[in-house]
Amino acid sequence: TYLQTPASVFRIDAPQVDTSSQVNLTEVVKGIPSLQLRNRENYAQDLQLSMRGFGARSTFGVRGIRLYVDGIPATMPDGQGQTSNIDLSSLDHVEVLTGPFSSLYGNSSGGTILTSTKEGQGKDSIELSYSGGSHDKSRAGLVLQGGAKGANEPSYVISSSYFDTDGYREHSGAEKVLNNAKLSWNLVDGSKINWVTNYVKIHADDPQGLNRDQWNANPKQQVPFLKQFNVRKDIEQTQTGVTWSKPINDKNELYAMAYLGNRQVTQYQSIPKSTQDASINHAGGVIDFERDYYGADFRWTGKELLPNTTVSVGVALDAMDEDRKGFENFNLVNGQPSYGVKGNLRRDEDNTLWNIDPYLQASWQFLPTWRLDTGVRYSNVHYKSKDNYLSNGDDSGKTDYSKVLPSAALSWQILPELMAYVSYAKGFETPTFTEMAYRPDGESGFNFDLTASTSDTYETGLKSQNQLGDFTLAVFQTKTKDDIVSAGNSNGRSTFRNADKTLREGLEFAWNKKLWRDLTATASYTYLDATFDADIPALGSIAQIPSGNAIPGIAKNQAYASLAWQPSHGLYGGVDVQYMDKVYVNDTNSDAAPSYSVTSANVGYAWVMGDWKVNSFARVDNLFDKNYAGSVIVNDGNRRYFEPADGRNWSAGLRVIKQF
């Protein structure tokens, strides 16, 4: 439970009446301290999430944070995560664990996000929904659900949605199809099975960033020079997984999970012909890869093996096979390049990765009010690349990473409603295939010089549940060696290198309380000082980074407050305010995206009439039309650091549910 967990853990339940468009995870996990959410207004690059400063380097997707959906990894075996396959229309709740404490999850530095889909219950029902808004944004959804009709029969939730938008900026339109299904069996022998399958297909144009003058002149624009490249991304992913748990008796339980998936991505970049012609080692301006990935987790949990103890022992296995190609992004027409097409082959390789991680976690209640939690995980990851494009030499290679990851926490239940804890955990983060794909020196082949980062996190916290509300206060320090940081971004291509030492120190505070009946207030604040803790030497044209500089992409202060009236039916509404401090955009700290505050408001009405339920809503985001950067592209080589956020924008929707 909340008070018994010796870590910063936050849970968000799906609201009884939802006023979101059910498109982006940022609509759900607002207000979590140390979780910085950045909506790029760019569906080609997914959301940017960072936790305690980890993940801010990512130019697309999620890094440094493990993602799970119904116990199935939404993070690839190499550590690259996506939120695009998380179905918000059937979401039950989200749990956020800040810090690397848990031994039950794979290697990461920042923390873990666990999302859970609703299970079918009660009568069969159908839900139809439609929402629309600014920039011709629209989403249509269908949800079918029902409870089990008898013993050993499944309950089910099946959802499907279609989303499209013209986008806030020029060349930022997107289309998305998302299908999700969850079947759950509660068997007569006490075991439980969940089977989850999802499919997502996205086509998204990429407006890329703006420099400061371009942003000030017109935040909606795409740089005119980039229009000729038709920069865009196509994504198609299918994944399925099964979880099984069975109590053997009142003291022993078994758990198993297995999953597999396929992901295909084609991305057209804005790299000119002259750049591609300049070196035989250049991989071209089109990225095209297909990944098959799979894994399993097996765990035994036993209670009272020794008095007042709980022990979990398990092993996790993951593997991925990637077929990666690179093509020129042009054809010659009358001797001139015509961009935005797939041209000649410039890269062809087969990449494989696998890991087998045994782990143990134990809890000992050695005194009535004192508990010791410990864990250890041996993480070992093996990369191999076979080069099939040999005209510029054979760049095949392999590398291995491994680390023993201990963790420990001591907690004291001072009062039934008050708990204090101290903890230590070692984190481990390996580079992804994408981070290793290009060398910062411009040479061909994988960047096998990029090593895994290791971190040591120390934390102390206080939790309380009383008549004044639920409180969480935590102070933490994370020291990282060989931190994986950006070496540069240019025309959509990113390179990475290791920073000898970095330091993150901070404070998290969260509070929520039901003030009266269905009126709830929430507030949170985070202070995070993230710096380079040693000089990073110059590398070619990349300048030296002096010790003490702030790590770019991370706000030092962030705050959130909300007030919501959410009855099960009738009139409902709410308002929230978010503050984000300025964010440096490069390692030299020569420029920054300014701080901002944005306000959102929503109102709606829910009718319940027998077997029918109707929910209507309207909302306005960025109520006061603030011009701010929703995200930054760290170390962009063309100084196009800024991805402007939407101005004042509205959305409205209707959901109709019929039970049978």
Give short role names for the model-derived ranges.
Residues 65, 72-98:
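Short acidic/polar hinge/loop motifs at secondary-structure boundaries
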Residues 100-102, 112-148, 160, 167, ...:
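Short strand-turn segments of transmembrane beta-barrel domains in outer membranes
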Residues 132-164, 169-207, 232-248, 313, ...:
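Transmembrane beta-barrel wall of Gram-negative outer-membrane proteins
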Residues 186, 198, 422, 458-460, ...:
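Conserved C-terminal beta-signal and adjacent last beta-strands/turns
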Residues 192-194, 198-200, 234-388, 469-475, ...:
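Face-selective signature of the C-terminal outer-membrane beta-barrel domain
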Residues 245, 253-271, 413, 419-425, ...:
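Membrane-embedded beta-barrel scaffold of Gram-negative outer-membrane proteins
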Residues 291, 301, 305-318, 349-480, ...:
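Structural signature of Gram-negative outer-membrane beta-barrels, strongest in the C-terminal barrel
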Residues 300-303, 367-368, 372, 381, ...:
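Gram-negative outer-membrane beta-barrel transporters
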